Amino acid sequence: MTHSQTEAPQHRGSRQGRKFDDRERQILELQLRDLSDGNVGRITPHGPLFARPPRSLQAERSTYVSTLSGRDKVIMAGIAALWAVAFSWFWLWWLQPGHLVSWVGMGVTSVLLLYLSTQACYFLIAVARLPRVRPSLKIPRLRLAIAVTRAPSEPWAMARRTLEAMKAQEFPYAYDVWLCDEDPSPEIYEWCAAQGIRVSTRKGVPEYNRSSWPRRTKCKEGNLAYFYDHWGYSQYDVVVQLDCDHEPSSTYLAEVVRPFSDEAIGYVAAPSICDANARTSWAARGRLYREAPFHGPFQLGHANRLAPVCIGSHYGVRTRALRDIGGLGPDLAEDFTTTFLFNSAGWQGAFAIDAEAHGLGPMTFADMVTQEYQWSRSLVAMMFGMIPRHMHRLPVRLRIRFTIVLIYYPLLALAAIAGLVLPAAASISGNIWVSVNYLAFLGNFFAMGLCMLFLLLLLRRRGLLRPHSAPVLSWELWLFTLARWPWVAWGVLGAIVQETFRRPIYFKVTPKDRSGSEVLPKRLVLPYGGIVTALSVAAVVGEMTGPAVGYVFLCILGACAYAVVGIAVSVLHVLEAAKAAGTRLRSAMITARTPLLLALAPLLPLALAIYVFPSYLFAVLGW
């Protein structure tokens, strides 16, 4: 058989495959166009494109009231003014001509400091508003359902507790409870029937197990799409969704449904409080404390025209609005894409700060890494797909708002990398980029941070953090912040590779229970060991060859910090594994023995850098 003969059948097969894909896409497009009453013009793998201009909807003024008292507003304005003074003073001091050594060094360092110092701006703008839904607003009487999703890897006992809490809501009107289960067992069917809970499953339905959006397999979007297409749109005005592990408080449903009395509101976001396992997981506590201001005052500040973001699958939707956008958005971050599509279509969002559902945070550090990687990859991937096709539909304020969200992860990764590379490069080269007094630098820079600390303490005192008791400062918060960024950077890189080479992406559901036998993969400690080694070597080279004392000190300081991170991650894994398994520390050591050795190995070059530094300092300063 000749080469041309072997090629011909493959070519015909590929053409037939493309015809099938095109035919399937056309059918789906017609279905979503019909569902949205013509608003979905066409669909792409990245999401829908709308045919009609956005709706002109605005919430009624009577829907919202201010959260803060007049006195608190004055105090917050005073703190904001102090921050502005500290910010201005820092930059006036920093840009003094006497600090300039090289334009390149000053420019690069200034860009990094500008990013770090302006992060507080957006937070200050958001918390200056804090409009909350009026508590006296009457709960509307609607056809209502509350639904929870469950994957096969999620324990039935956990889902059952959530369903029981859903049934026990203090709500003035009738509502239905649904379980959207990927693979319900006979036991689940029997229990749900006895409790009056309805079950939806797409198991064995190929049309709802597609490889890409819409109705994607192994994804909450596809699971919920089956429910909405068969019952949600036709039988209910509002549907409230929950993650399997998030057990709602008794007033959860009332708080989420209340804003829907305003016809302009298409969705209601709620706080994502992942503290159910906070006592047994430092990673869960770290994320919980890091995100407490976000899930409270920051989200609340975006209510009423600034698009609060749905986080997790716990939010409420007006089914008419969801039909309007063609259903839930694509990707792992369906919460964010759905929020974005609602706003692209012109619907308003509210934030129910008092709707509390307590769920699970990451069980282990490995789970935390998986989540950080997947979330950053998903959010960055949107910059290449759906987002640019809708941005022109948004008002300027929302374009700025969503742009800030989308660039958060890339800027976080770049800033962290730059913060490590700059002192190392200066130390090795011996080039002093700027000439400043370091104590003066620390004092002027951290004056801005002190203002933000006062603000967070005020917000915590007013009960606005979620959870209320989250500390403003803690060692878990510090460790989480330092440990997460390498995986965020890896997720950003993964998104770029994924979109450049059109590689398929797969999602991993993190475990919802722990046996204590989980092994800490050594690859999760390697980045910190690499950072410690690189900074220590840079410090030693600088001590042997150059006069850049300040940068050598920064290298040693950074190496010490990441040495603590690597060791702490390993030791804490052993401690938590022993507690979960009910064994002795010696027995649990096997779960992190190799990572601990990898974390300890870089202490040798670090010890050398620390040992040499005093004599190096005296020699350079001529003491």
What residue ranges belong to the model's regions?
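A conserved acidic beta->alpha catalytic loop
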Residues: D181-Y189, G204-P206
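Long helical/loop segments within the catalytic core of UDP-sugar-dependent glycosyltransferases
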Residues: T201-Y236, S250-A333, N343-S344, G361, ...
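Membrane-embedded multi-pass helical conduit in multi-pass membrane proteins
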Residues: F87-L114, A126-R129, P135-I139, Y408-F501, ...
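The conserved acidic donor/metal-binding loop of glycosyltransferases
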Residues: L242-E247
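Catalytic donor-sugar/metal-binding loop of nucleotide-sugar-dependent glycosyltransferases
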Residues: P330, T339-A357
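Short, acidic, metal-binding catalytic loop of nucleotide-sugar glycosyltransferases
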Residues: T162-A174
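Cell-envelope/extracellular polymer assembly enzymes that use nucleotide-activated donors
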Residues: R143-A147, D176, T337
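N-proximal low-complexity "stem/linker" segments adjacent to membrane-targeting elements
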Residues: L49-E164
